[in-house]
Amino acid sequence: MEIYVVRPGDSVDRIAQEFSVPAESIIWNNQLVFPYPLAVGQALLVGEYDETADPRRIDAGGYAYTYISNWVLRQTIPFLNRLFIFSYGFTLEGALVYPPRDESWMIGLCQENGTMPVLTLTPFGSDGKFNNNLIHQLVTNDVVSDELLDNLVFVMQQKGYGGIDIDFEYILAEDRDAFTAFVEKTVERMHENGFVVSVALAPKTSADQRGLLYEGKDYGALGNAADEVLLMTYEWGFKHGPPMAVAPLNMVRRVVDYAVTEIDPAKINLGVPNYGYDWPLPFVRGETEARTIGNVEAVQIAIQNGADIRFDDVASSPYFEYLDESGTEHVVW
């Protein structure tokens, strides 16, 4: 397969003829919607899929909520080595907070397809946001952490999980060493029971980077303790921030360049976003809120509004602008 960028005057039939492939394959591979209009600048996968190729020749994992569409997960899971099921929380006493829907069907799909199901642990408060006070209580209190680890091992054994992903954000700077010690303790306990441990890391570019997202995580120590790490190389462009690429390649490169100085590259997984944002303009900090959209949805917005999709060479990201029915300007990254 190769990537073809749509030019003015293109149609699915014309592209299919140029590449000597069935039009149906272009429609299927790119999730095109009848009557199959295209946007100038749209990137299309063109060519026949090699059915003999190993779908897991790239080591890949993905996060999924328990309410994900059954059809979507069934289409995706053959390509995943690991499925990170999102998510379990915990209380101040170390009791588990279960996902909103039972995830047994997802674990069953993993087992059918040879994919490892991974329990994602998050410190969400009652408001659904990361709670650093909850983290502090866990990492500084052995009674709480022992209770939580007992509960985790029980559930993981009972449900058939293969590992755990520790996805903690906004860790207090003063809890940095305590968090590392908690991860080391978790790894020891999980290894005793045959489980692997990964840790999600905010995208740092230096050891002394300031900010609540960064100061509580020691790249070197966490990378040494965990079996693998996920660099969260996304969300530069975010719902309440100014319009920009979600994962600008120039910024991603800076994170990776630093990470490999602290962590064994063989342990590093790179986060790749599968979504974008639609910002109304002008952007007003504290007021403007972007709408989260999927990749296919973004293309449909461009088509419906006659927008040409452009490409930012520095960020290596597509974007476009359009006017909605009320005359409001928008930019999509």
PLM features per residue range, with description:
Residues 84-87, 147-178, 228-242:
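Active-site groove signature of glycoside hydrolases
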Residues 60-62, 81-85, 117-121, 164-166, ...:
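Hydrophobic faces of well-ordered beta-strands that scaffold small-molecule active sites
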Residues 92-101, 176-304:
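Substrate-binding surface in catalytic domains of secreted glycosidases
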Residues 1-21, 42-44:
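Primarily a LysM-type cell-wall glycan-binding module
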Residues 12, 92-97, 134-142, 168-176, ...:
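Second-shell loop/turn segments in exported
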Residues 123-130, 134, 276-333:
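Glycan-binding loop/region signatures in secreted carbohydrate-active enzymes
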Residues 48-147, 151:
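Glycan-recognition patch characteristic of GH18 chitinases/ENGases
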